[in-house]
From Swiss-Prot:
Name of the protein in its database record: Uracil-DNA glycosylase
EC number: 3.2.2.27
Chief localization: cytoplasm
Coiled coil region boundaries: none
GO-annotated biological processes: base-excision repair, AP site formation via deaminated base removal
PANTHER family referenced in this protein's UniProt entry, alphabetically: URACIL-DNA GLYCOSYLASE (PTHR11264:SF0)
GO CC list: cytoplasm
GO molecular function, one term: uracil DNA N-glycosylase activity
Amino acid sequence: MKLFDYAPLSLAWREFLQSEFKKPYFLEIEKRYLEALKSPKTIFPKSSNLFYALNLTPPSAVKIILLGQDPYHSTYLENEQELPVAMGLSFSVEKNAPIPPSLKNIFKELHANLGVPVPCCGDLSAWAKRGMLLLNAILSVEKNQAASHQYIGWEAFSDQILMRLFKTTAPLIVVLLGKVAQKKIALIPKNKHIIITAPHPSPLSRGFLGSGVFSSVQKAYREVYRKDFDFSL
């Protein structure tokens, strides 16, 4: 079986990325990911959500990109069942999962900047449906092992996704939180898209709270689309 048998990808993205899927680097990603999936190890997010960020936001609908590093590797209990926190969207968690510290800080800053009520759950899929691509640079992870799937090679694929999007004519608003995400600035054509940077929202990082990052995003969105982005959840 092929990757897309385990991890569905929408027709719009298959057409947009068609030439990538036969390249040696992608065939190697497919091989390594399927090997990990078939091993005794537990892989997050579940394979059906591997491309959830892409499936919720078609290429033609992307207006904002909020880049993450890799999926949450932790679990939570629901009805005595251990479930993955990760759901395939950067920073987002399953509806009934506890809100992680980084996401709590995102909600705090969003409220401080724009007065958006702090939501009771951490599912950001509504943002994705409104045109915010919530893409992780690395798409999978082993349970309880942060950054364990760097070896798979996902970043080569996510870089291609970004570079293809950056070739579009409409200005994109690219939000890069933290030094790792900000390395992607090198991929972005100069003077074509709007780049907004801030420290990582992790409590271990300093400077995110009070950065005004969401005020900057909203200002840029108004300039490009003549309306506000709806951050409500």
